[in-house]
Amino acid sequence: DFNVEIVDQDLMRVMQTEINDVTKLPVQCKHGAIVKISNTRMSDEDDYYVQFNGENGKSGPGQWTEVAEPGIVKSLDATTMPHVLQRQSISGTNPVIFLAKKYEWEDRKVGDDVTNPIPSFVGEKINRVLFFRNRLVLLAGENVVTSRPGSIAKPNFWSDSALTVSAVDPIDISCASTYPSALFDAIEINTGLLCFSTNAQFLLSSDDTIMNPDTAKLRAVSWFNYNKVIPPISLGQTTGYIDNSNKYSRFMEMANIVREGEPAVVNTSKVVPTLLPKDIDLFTNSKENNIVLFGKTDSDTVIGFRYLNQADKRLQAAWFKWKFNNPLKYHFCIEDSYYLIDTDNFLQKVNLIQADADPSIDQDNTNYLIHLDNYTTVSGGTFASATNKTTFTNQSDWIDQVTSPNGKLVVVDTDPSTTREGRYAECTVINNDDFTIPGDWSREVTSITVTNGGSGYTSAPTVTISGGGGSAATATATIESGAVTAVTINNNGYNFTSVPTVAFSGGGGSSAAATAAIHTGEFNIGYLYDYQVDFPRFYLQKTSDDSVSSDINSKLTVHRMKLNFGKIGLYETTLTRVGKAAYTEIYESTDLDEYDASDAPYLDEKIKDIPVYERNLNVDVTLKSSHPAPATLRSMSWEGDWSPMHYRRV
């Protein structure tokens, strides 16, 4: 130890590791020297550290830069921080590969544990990772911690300087309240970041245009229960989430979320209080199609909610169920499609709106969608006239992929060039890779075109169709002015693999020629599935403003129902009556002798009367369709006798 005494401070200054005036820092010093600047003797909140960087890395002249306190923790442990799933570049025919790896996190470069403290998520469980206003956000405990904006490539949760507070500094804010308020999820809305705890909702927002540590506010906006397993979703104008605090789950919607004031929260599932099970853990939606889907792992049933909004009003809403052939493991929506992964690790896709690849029939300027599950196409069947069956072989590349189908396997012809458009038949699978269909589904002769009428014909010549691998095709020629003008097919034949030859003989003429065409299209094959509508109990209803009331005290006898269909084919109705056997009747949209044989028996709209004649309390009505044809129900009305029973309220 030694002492140094300075007579004139203008000539020499002495310091060790700490000074209280930054102006006393020398202009020349040892390279790498670190000095603590203690601005206020009784406070640590304005202290900071500087390091001398000599020119060319040598002691002597240089400059002082702000650094972190020596010996403190300066980095985050990447092994316990969130990892990333990074898609690798695709080369050639290689499949898409995702790489799971540790992420890079920015180190603390300035300050100490007081002026630039460790983020509050260190030592806590991180419940959620998301993005908000160009910042990476971590939810841990009761805190919302955001990185510096624009640092997604290498997130920075540290301040850039211990001297001042910057608008781009990270935000670390708590939502502490009188109730346990650990945050489990959040969703971005127009007014900020809506955060969810199990019994309250908080809004991270700012009164200023730019959100920074000084302007950020995290305050409670509502106090409702929340299922922490399922993330909230945006429905466009509202935010939806699940509450499972009771025996059944509830689907809640929150609207009008503002910085000041309470939002409007509605229990949307109140009309179906027992529909949603308590242990729902799968939740997705498609805003473009106004649909919300609820599922449960290892369950084969998905519950759906469909709604129609106009401006800020909900005009219509309905609940429904989908039943799949295997239980779910996960599901999600992308654009206009719903995807699910079942317990066989099979990815299935359901188009929420009609896609170009979906099988359909065009007729009278109207397109009719064909409804098949797990559909694909087949061709090249062989017809056996002895058994009147067509056999399709070598189908193992797709039949065994569909496990535990719910419905029957059927084939539908949607080719407009054939005379059997709209025809369908049930398949019988044999040996797990072949199947047979009743009737002739092989390639047939579809048309014959006269290319040379010839001359000198005094009677119709005989038409011979040969070759092409098929048989039994016959046709008749028509002559006019000594020439063949047309050929009419009497029998389309079967089992053609190539175009046959058409020849003319007899009739006294010569030189007539024609070419044939065969069916080269494919058939759509898939599994039938049930469409079912259970109508609610009928009551006389009265509408006043936006509310509807039902008269449940009066006597009502329903005479008939009127079902207003859009595109429709085959369907059935069942009346389940008290004290009587259930009555089921099958309806076809078109009657015999009212449509061409080559047309599909579908209509673009129809109103059908269903006889009932029962008291409303004694009958339940079900509409069902298991046919590939469409069955679009637009509305339902009823006619009947109503009597108030002379009741008067007192």
Segments from the language model and where they lie:
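Tryptophan-centered short beta-strand motifs
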Residues: 44, 55-78, 95-100, 105-107, ...
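Ser/Thr/Gly-rich low-complexity blocks that favor extended beta-strand/coil architectures
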Residues: 1, 33-57, 64-75, 81, ...
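Surface-exposed interaction regions enriched in Ser/Thr/Asp/Glu
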Residues: 65-73, 92-103, 107, 438-442, ...
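Conserved, function-critical positions that sit in or immediately flank catalytic
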Residues: 383, 440-519
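Beta-sheet repeat architectures centered on beta-propellers
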Residues: 247-442, 519-650
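Short, exposed beta-strand/loop patches in secreted or surface proteins that constitute
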Residues: 4, 40, 84-86, 129, ...
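Beta-propeller and closely related beta-pinwheel folds
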Residues: 104-134, 139-290, 294-332
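Long, charge-dense tracts
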Residues: 1-120
